[in-house]
Amino acid sequence: MTPGLDRARALLKRTRRVAVLTGAGMSAESGVPTFRDAQTGLWSQFDPMQLACEEGFRADPALVWRWYAWRRALVAEAKPNAGHRALAAARDKLSLITQNVDGLHVRAGSTHALELHGNILRSKCLSNCGKRFDTPEELPQGEPPRCLTCGDWLRPDVVWFGELLDPRILAAAESAAEDCDLMLVVGTSGLVYPAAGLPARAARRNAPVVIINPNESDLDDGADLVIRSTAALALPALFD
């Protein structure tokens, strides 16, 4: 058995409220490339930071929409892995927070996942009318569709560079971290805030923090237990 897994199982058995934070490493196991790994082929000549921002979208809506359409196609080919399914099976026992925008947790059955950075399979109005839609097909000329309410462009329903997280989702995630008896941190580098600050919120309330990651992360030093394994291997064993 993976070192540390027995101890994690013992911690899990005596807790009532579990919070789970997942990151890009979990989706990578399903074949979803990380944000920068997605810059291949035609798109390797573009800076992703210029495509994932409002300024870039306003400068060339068709280009940015095509990039996201390509990324959506990659996501559509991916399937939830054993780690996603394990969390979905235990969904009534935990609060699930994810940095991933691929919707794999929801597809696995975790219908109440808190998607901190949005969902690439949804669109929202570029203006402040607030309407959200399942992403429609692009127009023949490759331009993004228009909002059915106000007529402005639709944009991906994800958090772009320079934007704040949805305050309601962030508040719910912070509450889950502060109220939990145990926090699992799965497949995240710990570099992106405010998500990376959630484990510290749990630790300040004396909740053990357990990291599941085959690679080192910036959160390792503050964790009570680090399990060097992948989500697809460790989570089914942990929640068995």
Positions of the model-derived regions?
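Conserved catalytic core of sirtuin-type NAD+-dependent deacylases
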Residues: 1-240
